[in-house]
């Protein structure tokens, strides 16, 4: 029994020790949350310049009538969707999209709707996938971009196009009518005839989408390599340099639907099928002024074509003829159009008709252009346009061309080819991967850790590897692939804010979230989960998520509001800034980040992301100037981490606006847990006269041989800039000789940030020593420090749901009071730390002593 009692007592003591340790850690954490973290920035030090009007954008997809956002009857984007888009203020819009852009044929999406052709999905051979209506074409996206003031980022289809086609595109987008730099068809006039006389002035071009994801055995279902996987030397070399692609018994396709099931013979006369990766015909002017195919163009290599008809298990080769008119009714012959890649069969009178349900197979070779040739075509055509226009205002068209082949091998290959001048950067899609966790909190923490490992570090590595001057281009990012409802919640909004700040620092010219719109559902399609869209489309009665036709209800997710806050919260000049400390989550992910910038109107702009799920943070703003009296417009979004909006409750998660007038030169602001906060610190009111700095310096007397520092005891303060540091350069005159008795003078000069200069001269008397001895110093008559009164205790905050009530983004926190810009800790801070530290140490010490004594006895 004695042993049992002893054992039980030891367990009790260990339990008490653990509890004391937990209490100590809680106290330390509470203390740390109340101690201000200094955010330092120098408004005179610009780290990089951004286009704040366009940097935060979104990836949009033309398919399925823009996922329900486009009305094919009016041929315009729907008004209610446009209103939401404008509300967010997306700065740039990526078109025709990601994977879905890889086989986009732009020339067949312009002009009258009846003359357009259906487009081919990037994953065209998945079950149920068919041709895509070409309603939302180049003209339609350009009209929309003009209306909403967004910059177009164009993804060029390397899977379908070539250098000539790319050059024609640049003319269509950016040339003035009549310049026609490449001759042939005046594509600028075609644009004008289609209703847009002025150029679109597109300056960003991505060549393909994620074309490093090239899997040879999954063309049409999962691979984005297309013809590059059929080139000797591998897809990376093919993408970069082009080459001859060789195909053996590849099924031939319908012109407007490449799905295998849709490409079988219909058993009708005049069947025509196509070689998938033939070069697109560049077109020419016909005799009647119409645009027609160029019959001299070589779409596939002559003599390389063989054709079979049958099925995968059994098929028969058909003979190639130059003219079907010479064939008999039962002759199994086919005519090849080498200018388009078409395979034409007979009508039952001249040449046999492949039986209904049979597949057509074709072997062929084709010479394809790679990235380098296409980039040259884009940049050279841009130069030709500039030469032809002969502008006198100093402005010029620019064409920034980015590779979509995300690999270190591409970087090395371009350097070895001496071709670095032909790419301006690399598109990187740093998706998170799927977060894991049994609870919303665990999922959240893992997502924020993945934000660093996959979302940011991957980009940093490519920045390190690329040559100087090349930029990372973040045209898709986010939490992917995950169908959790949390992807539509506050959690994803904070993920976006966290990584976006780093992408700004890393130099991305535009940062585009994937994706603009998708169906509101609990699932996914071949392009990914629908939850990742920042605007959700809810189908109403009769609406189709297959075609995107019909009525949809639209609402903004918290992610959309995060992008709104980021876009409104950044200025063109990003400042170098640092945090005095970087708190972390339990898994090591950084939980606090900030970005400071300024705009052309003199506003200082601050974006703060606090990922901690339980603790607010207080930041002291040290911006090298006096902020007292300046007004800050504040926006905060701090909903619960699983909070989301719905069509019925669209305002469940929205930013909250407030304002604060700073009462200190270096004020403090407090941000709530799991929050995104922006501050727009306005300049002083118009009419405020810049005050000159004030120098405080007194005449001094020293004794021969004393050390002399002309800045000792000298201070300078400016009403706008605050305390001004002094250095040797501020001593503009100094004739003091500390070894020779006499009267001397020192002049101190300072200049504030707005150019106001002040000088002050003081006298220094050097006196001889008396009797060769140095007098004893006088005793200091000043009294000792006053004891600090014990602050009154304040109640400890409740759990996470009550944090917002206790901490406000107004420069103060409940339980705190401002004193010249300095924060006094409440009883929940330093006092609690001291009390609990003593209690914990006594408990731990008592437990150890008791255990030691028991062991001795």
Which residues are covered by each model-predicted region?
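Serine/threonine-rich, repeat-prone extracellular segments and beta-strand-based repeat modules
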Residues: 5-19, 721-762
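N-terminal catalytic cores of secreted or lumenal carbohydrate-active enzymes
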Residues: 35-250, 254, 366-421
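Noncatalytic carbohydrate-binding groove/subsite architecture in carbohydrate-active enzymes
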Residues: 173, 246, 367-502, 506, ...
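Extended beta-strand solenoid/passenger and fiber regions
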Residues: 237-349, 354-366
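Aromatic/acidic polysaccharide-binding cleft in carbohydrate-active enzymes
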Residues: 474, 478-593
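Carbohydrate-binding surface patches
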Residues: 587-628, 634-638, 674-680
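C-terminal low-complexity, Ser/Thr- and acidic/Pro-rich disordered "stalk" regions positioned immediately N-terminal
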Residues: 768-827
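C-terminal membrane-anchoring or membrane-association module
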Residues: 837-857
